[in-house]
């Protein structure tokens, strides 16, 4: 992709024009080109370009596009430090101001570079940082498949890969994209190995807390399989996660009574935890029983008789459980419930169900062929 130039002249003259323009705006820069070559000129121009960022958007974009067009003709090994310097300027200059302009300038640079250029990673990270400051992350490509491809294309080492994923995660969280953020965090934690899992302690801790805090997240068993999370075994945060994975409400109540300060230190709401654990307990009951008496509901969920109906209605709204209320017989009739954990037993049940469907379809097909040989 070509980037519009500041003026259609030679690179040396273009650098000279940029120097003159910046000096006219008050920058401390010589109007004479450096004897060190274009990359030295660009280093000095980028260092002084702050002054033009105060101008009108069109003027700023014209100047910055000129700088970008010169950057892109440099040898790859000379680009990296200069691009990093320019990105830092655009991210930090009057942070919070004119985000759409800064995003446009970074986007011009990003799309003007070859797709496989490693330093493109720096530009992408800068775009994410600016987008997060103005709640514009939805306009950024953060799809995991695309991000995975870039990680490969840019040949990122482990540290840069983790930094990129963590940055995307934090931006999504800041912009209230909790579901997308959770997927990115799982991707991040899943990229650690047995050898470096201990380094992800903070990320694993944060991932668990975010998941527990999210009012729309009810399934947690996949987190237990992540190596950094397994590294937390024996700690209170892991014990708490295990309760939300498979235990009942009473287990959470006992945990809370012994660890009130810990729950508060995590920034978790006890009332929200109670509400979520009631639903999770109900889900577990609904898997095992197709009919649940009001009395059992009251006892297991620690709610009053007058609250059972409202609870069931709210539970059905989450689409984790499908059931109806039988007022006459004072019971809840379950038609379906999501499993809180999905292990070998659940896979076997799924296999048996699919085999049964296959057999039934074969029977239907045979019956149709009997009625009509051409069927």
Curated annotation (Swiss-Prot):
**What is one term from the GO cellular component aspect held by the record?**
eukaryotic translation initiation factor 3 complex, eIF3m
Pfam families (alphabetical): eIF3m_C_helix, PCI
The compartments listed are:
Cytoplasm
Organism superkingdom: Eukaryota
Residues in a coiled coil are: none
List, in alphabetical order, the Gene Ontology terms for molecular function in this entry. translation initiation factor activity
Swiss-Prot/TrEMBL GO biological process terms? cytoplasmic translational initiation; formation of cytoplasmic translation initiation complex
Q: Which UniProt keywords apply?
A: Cytoplasm, Initiation factor, Protein biosynthesis
Q: Does the keyword Protein biosynthesis apply?
A: yes
Occurrences of domain PCI (ranges) = 180-339
The record's listing under PROSITE patterns reads:
PCI
The entry's family comment says: Belongs to the eIF-3 subunit M family.
| Function of the molecule | Component of the eukaryotic translation initiation factor 3 (eIF-3) complex, which is involved in protein synthesis of a specialized repertoire of mRNAs and, together with other initiation factors, stimulates binding of mRNA and methionyl-tRNAi to the 40S ribosome. The eIF-3 complex specifically targets and initiates translation of a subset of mRNAs involved in cell proliferation.
Partners and quaternary state? Component of the eukaryotic translation initiation factor 3 (eIF-3) complex, which is composed of 13 subunits: eif3a, eif3b, eif3c, eif3d, eif3e, eif3f, eif3g, eif3h, eif3i, eif3j, eif3k, eif3l and eif3m.
- Please name the PANTHER family in this protein's record: COP9 SIGNALOSOME COMPLEX SUBUNIT 7/DENDRITIC CELL PROTEIN GA17, EUKARYOTIC TRANSLATION INITIATION FACTOR 3 SUBUNIT M
The protein's name is Eukaryotic translation initiation factor 3 subunit M
